[in-house]
Swiss-Prot record:
Family (UniProt): Belongs to the universal ribosomal protein uL24 family.
Gene name per UniProt: rplX
Cross-referenced InterPro entries: KOW (IPR005824), Rib_uL2_dom2 (IPR014722), Ribosomal_uL24 (IPR003256), Ribosomal_uL24_CS (IPR005825), Ribosomal_uL24_KOW (IPR041988), Translation_prot_SH3-like_sf (IPR008991)
PANTHER family: MITOCHONDRIAL RIBOSOMAL PROTEIN L24
SS bond list: none
Protein name (Swiss-Prot/TrEMBL): Large ribosomal subunit protein uL24
Pfam family, one: KOW
Alphabetized UniProt keyword annotations: Ribonucleoprotein, Ribosomal protein, RNA-binding, rRNA-binding
Record organism: Chlamydia pneumoniae (Chlamydophila pneumoniae)
Role played: One of two assembly initiator proteins, it binds directly to the 5'-end of the 23S rRNA, where it nucleates assembly of the 50S subunit. One of the proteins that surrounds the polypeptide exit tunnel on the outside of the subunit.
Gene Ontology BP annotations: translation
Domain of life according to the entry: Bacteria
A cellular component annotation (GO) from this entry: ribosome
GO MF entries: rRNA binding; structural constituent of ribosome
Length: 111
């Protein structure tokens, strides 16, 4: 499995789809899909029941593929790469203009 640089709670930028150009917070994450707050909103119809005698329509965020989002740092979409230090720690590294800047540790790696 490829290492993912996106975690729940991160701010992301939408690269493709109907909501292209929007930003939002990651609500949930699976292996290849993310649910972003306020993005890819779908309307779901709830049938009539004893609790809802008239029925209702609710808005939910549908998942989008992880390749269609990019992590934002300081309000700009950022590409991250993995760097292995001399101690064997793996770090996410940001390269906005050719320079390297530490972003955070790769999840699950201790050192």
């Amino acid at each position: 499995m490829k290492k993912q640089n996106i975690r729940v709670g991160d701010k992301v930028f939408i690269l493709a789809g109907n909501d292209k150009g929007k930003e939002g917070k990651v609500l949930s994450l699976t292996e290849d899909k993310v649910v972003v707050e306020g993005v890819n909103v779908r309307i779901k119809n709830i049938k009539r029941s004893q609790q809802n005698p008239k029925g209702k329509r609710i808005s939910i965020e549908a998942p989008i593929h992880i390749s269609n989002v990019r992590l934002t740092i300081a309000g700009e979409p950022a590409k991250l790469s993995v760097k292995v230090t001399e101690q064997g720690r793996e770090l996410w590294q940001r390269r906005p203009d050719g320079t390297s800047q530490l972003y955070r540790l790769v999840r699950g790696k201790k050192g």
